[in-house]
């Protein structure tokens, strides 16, 4: 890749250069580590002091932050890339540099096993020990890295990337431009069992999981996340969703477009999460719920009922405290039931006294 100039990056991203548009940008780096040929960004005013002292060749800023820098008398003689949203501008420029470092190999490694009826486009790369079973469909420019598995009649969309040790089970669908990180499992059986009374107690009869797991376009799934196939209908992850590491998505779940789910969250079966939601790490959802669009759920929160009003923010985690204070509060919480009974007794007694006083006045 030819080294871009600051002016070229501005043109590509709808930004404005304040300074030298011919400055060559060789890479990106944090404010406190960037050198003279590197580009950094300021998206949080808390880091304004770092921006003022940074040795970066140029810094992406908002117009408002540049005015603050000018007020400090620090803007002159430096290079700034003024963008409407510095964080998004940084992300797009980072993508530009990342493309130059991507693996450009094509072809099928001789150690891969590809079923005879599968057509792999010449633009694809299939790594060593990859297994692609009969009836699978592989799109253009797909990259499937070592030891991954694509089951019978599964579909992988154009420009998707499957890192090492990814499994996409039979009949499942991965849309275009997906990124599946190592250890992801798409389409394992959902947790479906029918309880029956056997001679020694409850026995569980397996319910075959005959639905699929279907991922839309531009979905990214983090390492060791599992998205189970549906029992009869499909489990669906809509376009643009971003799912972090070690997330469990159970059977028949639907996650709406452009929702983000942070690590270690768990969504129980048949729950539907709306569009543009933000789900914090280790949040968990009971089954068969409906979660409205644009809902935010804080990390560690347990959602046990449906949320019907869009745009809400929900938190159920008790903030951390010094250990001794937490123990004292925990003791109070343990006694809440008895305390409630005492309060109710006092209320009844007060109501009785009030009624007696009223009678005597009459």
Swiss-Prot record:
Swiss-Prot/TrEMBL catalytic activity: a UDP-3-O-[(3R)-3-hydroxyacyl]-alpha-D-glucosamine + a (3R)-hydroxyacyl-[ACP] = a UDP-2-N,3-O-bis[(3R)-3-hydroxyacyl]-alpha-D-glucosamine + holo-[ACP] + H(+)
GO cellular component: membrane
SUPFAM superfamilies, per database record: Trimeric LpxA-like enzymes
One GO BP: lipid A biosynthetic process
Pfam families xrefs: Hexapep, LpxD
InterPro entries found in the cross-reference section: Hexapep, LpxD, Trimer_LpxA-like_sf, UDP_GlcNAc_AcTrfase_non-rep
Keyword Repeat assigned: yes
Catalytic center residues: 251 (proton acceptor)
Keywords linked to the UniProt accession: Acyltransferase, Lipid A biosynthesis, Lipid biosynthesis, Lipid metabolism, Repeat, Transferase
Record family assignment: Belongs to the transferase hexapeptide repeat family. LpxD subfamily.
Functional note: Catalyzes the N-acylation of UDP-3-O-acylglucosamine using 3-hydroxyacyl-ACP as the acyl donor. Is involved in the biosynthesis of lipid A, a phosphorylated glycolipid that anchors the lipopolysaccharide to the outer membrane of the cell.
NCBIfam families, per database record: lipid_A_lpxD, PRK00892.1
Protein name: UDP-3-O-acylglucosamine N-acyltransferase
Gene label: lpxD
């Amino acid at each position: 890749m030819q080294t871009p100039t600051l002016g070229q990056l501005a043109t590509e991203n709808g930004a404005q250069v304040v300074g030298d548009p011919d400055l060559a940008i060789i890479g990106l780096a944090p404010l406190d580590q960037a050198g003279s040929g590197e580009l950094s960004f300021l998206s949080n005013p808390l880091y304004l002091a770092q921006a003022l002292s940074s040795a970066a060749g140029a810094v992406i800023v908002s117009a408002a932050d540049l005015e603050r820098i000018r007020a400090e008398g620090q803007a002159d003689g430096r290079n700034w890339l003024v963008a409407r949203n510095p964080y998004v501008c940084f992300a797009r420029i980072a993508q530009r540099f990342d493309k130059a470092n991507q693996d450009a190999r094509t072809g099928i490694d001789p150690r891969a096993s590809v079923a005879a009826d599968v057509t792999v486009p010449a633009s694809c790369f299939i790594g060593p020990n990859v297994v692609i079973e009969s009836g699978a469909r592989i799109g253009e420019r797909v990259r499937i890295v070592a030891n991954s598995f694509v089951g019978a009649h599964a579909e992988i969309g154009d420009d998707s990337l499957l890192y090492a040790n990814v499994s996409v089970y039979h009949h499942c669908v991965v849309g275009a431009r997906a990124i599946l990180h190592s250890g992801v499992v798409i389409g394992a059986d959902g947790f479906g069992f029918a309880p029956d009374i056997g001679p020694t107690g409850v026995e569980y009869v397996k319910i075959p999981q005959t639905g699929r797991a279907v991922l839309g376009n531009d979905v990214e799934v983090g390492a060791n996340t599992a998205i189970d196939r549906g029992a009869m209908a499909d489990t669906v992850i809509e376009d643009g969703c971003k799912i972090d590491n070690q997330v469990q998505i159970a059977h028949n779940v639907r996650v709406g477009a452009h929702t983000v789910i942070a690590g270690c969250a768990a969504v129980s079966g048949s729950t539907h999460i709306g569009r543009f939601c933000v789900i914090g790490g280790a949040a968990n959802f009971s089954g068969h719920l409906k979660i409205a669009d644009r809902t935010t759920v804080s990390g560690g929160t347990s959602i046990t009922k449906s949320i019907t009003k869009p745009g809400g923010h929900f938190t159920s985690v008790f903030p951390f405290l010094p250990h001794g204070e937490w123990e004292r509060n925990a003791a109070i919480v343990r006694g809440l039931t008895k305390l409630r009974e005492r309060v109710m007794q006092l209320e009844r007694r007060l109501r009785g006294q009030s009624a007696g006083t009223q009678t005597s006045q009459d």
